[in-house]
Design a protein with these regions (language model features):
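Hydrophobic, well-ordered secondary-structure segments
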Residues: 115, 131, 135-138, 182-189
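Flexible, polar/acidic helix-loop-strand segments at domain edges
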Residues: 138-149
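Enzymes that bind and transform nitrogen-containing heteroaromatic metabolites
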Residues: 1-8, 12-26, 41, 61, ...
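N-terminal glycine-rich anion-binding loops that anchor highly charged ligand groups
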Residues: 22-36
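N-terminal pre-triad scaffold of radical SAM enzymes
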Residues: 69-79, 147-158
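Zn2+-dependent cytidine deaminase-like catalytic core
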Residues: 32-133, 220, 298
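Residues that form or flank phosphate/diphosphate-binding pockets in enzymes
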Residues: 51, 82, 109-110, 136, ...
């Protein structure tokens, strides 16, 4: 690992501290180095507050050292006025002579302009250090800004013989997840802006779709209810968490936290849902079920990541798990006793985000 890679790696570590809090902004970390000694660090804590570069500069006790220092940042410094002033201007103002950047910012108001501004000011700029790792960190932000849709994560648990539930018209679903994997699912919920289920899952499971087993915000809850036949006493309509209902009808009893959105069900509704979520600035979507809904995303090649829990249990029959003839690019396996959580990307889409 080179010196630049070492400090950008530290930027990535810092950036992760902003997980669940920065959206719709990306997670960013920054490190300031004076003669091979770190004199300042910072990360973007939450949207609307100071960016990583600002926090790193503020942490330096002797600002006179900045004139002989290098600032490392995982993402290109911004060059526009948003909720905060441009970071590129602050770097220029503090006369920091060198900037090392992990990856360029895909956001249209930046997209190389920060780098250009720094270079025009006579600052030495290096770009592309640990670029793949830096892009992976902000994969949700990149997908949203380049593909104009949320980053989509699929999640399900299945038995060894490929079923996600027993055949039923009521009662509780069969419990496949253990307490540890259930907690991991709630962590994933906290990391996403929204969570989607179909009508059958909402009716039979009556899920809260909350993060009760993990700290952090609740995602916006999404449910497809074409004919508005779901009972109003379901947990989804409790009014405690923001909920979108996709339907072809007009609502009967709207409330402040339940929004009804009309779709054209004579056409494919997934692109319509993606457009709605993009307009509402929802950058990441977790799809939890059921099997038909998950399969529709797979068949449409409309997913970026999947978490598949393999459970050492044989059901023999029931609701079949989603399947795909396409090859997965396996990222890693997480073991919980005899259970395995597979984290995978569709091979044809990995290049769009990470490379």
């Amino acid at each position: 690992m080179t010196k630049d890679e070492k400090y950008i790696s530290r930027c990535l570590q810092l950036a992760h501290n902003g997980l669940c809090n920065t959206a719709p902004n990306p997670m960013v970390g920054a490190v300031i180095v004076y003669h091979d000694t770190i004199i300042g660090e910072g990360y973007h804590i939450r949207c609307g507050e100071a960016h990583a570069e600002v926090n790193a500069i503020r942490s330096v006790k002797d600002e006179n050292l900045l004139k002989e220092s290098t600032i490392y940042v995982s993402l290109e410094p911004c060059s526009h006025y948003g909720k905060t002033p441009p970071c590129a201007d602050l770097i220029i103002e503090k006369k920091i002579p060198k900037v090392v950047i992990g990856c360029m910012d895909p956001f249209s108001l930046v997209a190389g302009r920060g780098i250009e501004k720094l270079r025009k000011a006579g600052i030495e700029v290096t770009v592309g250090v640990l670029e793949e790792e830096c892009r992976h960190l902000i994969r949700r932000f990149i997908t949203f800004n380049t593909l104009k849709r949320p980053y989509i994560t699929l999640k399900w648990a299945e038995s060894t013989d490929g079923f996600i539930d027993i055949n039923r018209t009521g009662g509780k679903p069969i419990k496949l997840s253990n307490p540890l994997t259930s907690m991991l699912v709630h962590k994933k919920r906290a990391e996403h802006d929204a969570i989607l289920v179909g009508r059958r899952t909402a009716l039979l499971d009556n899920p809260s779709l909350s993060t009760r087993n993990w700290y952090g915000k609740h995602p916006v809850r999404l449910v497809i209810d074409k004919e508005l036949t779901l009972p109003r006493d379901l947990e989804l309509f409790s009014g405690r968490i923001k909920t979108f209902v996709f339907t072809r009808k007009s609502p009967h009893q709207p409330n402040t936290l339940t929004e009804y959105i009309s779709l054209d069900f004579s056409k494919d509704i997934l692109p319509q849902i993606m457009e709605v979520l993009y307009q509402k600035k929802i950058q990441s979507l977790l799809v939890e079920g059921g099997s038909i809904l998950l399969q529709s995303f797979i068949d449409s090649s409309l997913w970026d990541e999947a978490f598949i829990e393999k459970v050492p249990l044989c059901l023999k029959n029931g609701i079949e798990a989603p399947s795909s003839q396409k090859k997965y690019f396996k990222l890693n396996k997480i073991y919980f006793g005899r259970e395995i959580m597979h984290a995978v990307h569709p091979q044809n889409q990995r290049q769009n985000v990470a490379d």
